[in-house]
Amino acid sequence: MVLIRVLANLLILQLSYAQKSSELVIGGDECNINEHRSLALVYITSGFLCGGTLINQQWVLTAAHCDRGNMLIFFDVHSLKGLNKDVQSRVAKEKFICPNRKKDDEKDKDIMLIKLDSPVSNSEHIAPLSLPSNPPSVGSVCRIMGWGAITSPNVTLPGVPHCANINILDYEVCRKAYTGLPATSRTLCAGILEGGKDSCKGDSGGPLICNGQFQGIVSWGAHPCGQSLKPGVYTKVFDYTEWIQSILAGNADATCPP
């Protein structure tokens, strides 16, 4: 009953944002149901929506700015308009955010680990995505996915996850696009220089997958989404692998890299 009620609320949320529009998704298409096995839908009871990535049977990685109180995490969700009998739902038992994260800057160290109240079971449409063994190189083709907006600035939420291919860009592209970025950063700059492909509202916390490896977490970007010379900024997962492994090993006091 809880699952039915929550998915009904998600549908209401999706319909409440919908605008009459013939525009296509921001550079992407509906994901193949077999390509988002690690994608988690992170739902907060207030209606706030994020994505996440299953990294093993009991842990999900998402963005720290998605931390909004009580969380329900769903797996094997495709359409928000209909119940899939194989959907698995879990409660966030514990949440871990970098202890050295700047409290007044939600863009800083935008990464959060969620421990589920019980492990999920692998299935045809549920499987974890392993952490990266190396960082991505500039020019790498990467996949973004999520239930986020398919039009911007007028928001239309699609009700099914959409996927698009973007590229890893030189960090200097983002420094030119957004004032105030530091000279070095534990983030990835990714997008299409001419615009038209981008993550957007509701995609936060979802994965950036490059050559089959989980390389980034959707963090922030320009509004409206998909502007030329305004790529997205993604948390660089590779730089946090030691912290992630420490938390998974039981070291709750582990500190993130500066």
Curated annotation (Swiss-Prot):
Its EC number is 3.4.21.-. Residues 1-18 form the signal peptide. Snake venom serine protease that may act in the hemostasis system of the prey. Expressed by the venom gland. Disulfide bonds join C31-C163, C50-C66, C98-C256, C142-C210, C174-C189, C200-C225. InterPro entries: Peptidase_S1_PA, Peptidase_S1_PA_chymotrypsin, Peptidase_S1A, Trypsin_dom, TRYPSIN_HIS, TRYPSIN_SER. The active site is at H65, D110, S204. It is found in: Secreted. SUPFAM superfamilies: Trypsin-like serine proteases. GO terms for biological process: proteolysis. Pfam families: Trypsin. Residues 19-24 form a propeptide. The keyword Glycosyltransferase does not apply. The keyword Signal applies. It comes from Lachesis stenophrys (Central American bushmaster). GO terms for cellular component: extracellular region; secretory granule. Glycans are attached at N154. It comes from the Eukaryota. Monomer. Residues 25-249 form the Peptidase S1 domain. GO terms for molecular function: serine-type endopeptidase activity; toxin activity. Coiled coil: none annotated. Keywords: Disulfide bond, Glycoprotein, Hemostasis impairing toxin, Hydrolase, Protease, Secreted, Serine protease, Signal, Toxin. Belongs to the peptidase S1 family. Snake venom subfamily. This is Snake venom serine protease. It is an enzyme of class 3 (hydrolase).
